């Protein structure tokens, strides 16, 4: 449920929504959501001083309802 919600939000931010990929992985410390976007959109997703990325992490934490979830913006 978290990956589709995060995908929807990120697609609304970027200029190339077809390139947005969110992959959910399990780790011993909880779930990890890896966000991959077009390299041209990386700055939009991270935001000035990381503000947008922090807002995305806050949103996912609220939706996680107490579960441990980490959001990583991956730079390929």
UniProtKB/Swiss-Prot annotation:
PROSITE patterns: KH_TYPE_1. GO terms for cellular component: cytoplasm. The keyword Cytoplasm applies. Residues 30-76 form the KH domain. The keyword Kinase does not apply. It is found in: Cytoplasm. Keywords: Cytoplasm, RNA-binding. One of its GO terms (molecular function) is RNA binding. A probable RNA-binding protein. Belongs to the KhpA RNA-binding protein family. This is RNA-binding protein KhpA. The lineage of its organism: Bacteria, Bacillati, Actinomycetota, Actinomycetes, Micrococcales.
């Amino acid at each position: 449920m978290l990956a589709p919600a995060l995908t929807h939000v990120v697609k609304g931010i970027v200029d190339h929504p077809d390139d947005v990929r969110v992959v959910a992985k399990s780790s011993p410390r909880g779930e990890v959501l890896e966000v991959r976007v077009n390299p041209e959109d990386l700055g939009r997703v991270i935001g000035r001083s990381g503000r947008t990325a922090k807002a995305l992490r806050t949103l996912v934490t609220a939706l996680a309802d107490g579960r441990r979830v980490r959001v990583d913006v991956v730079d390929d």
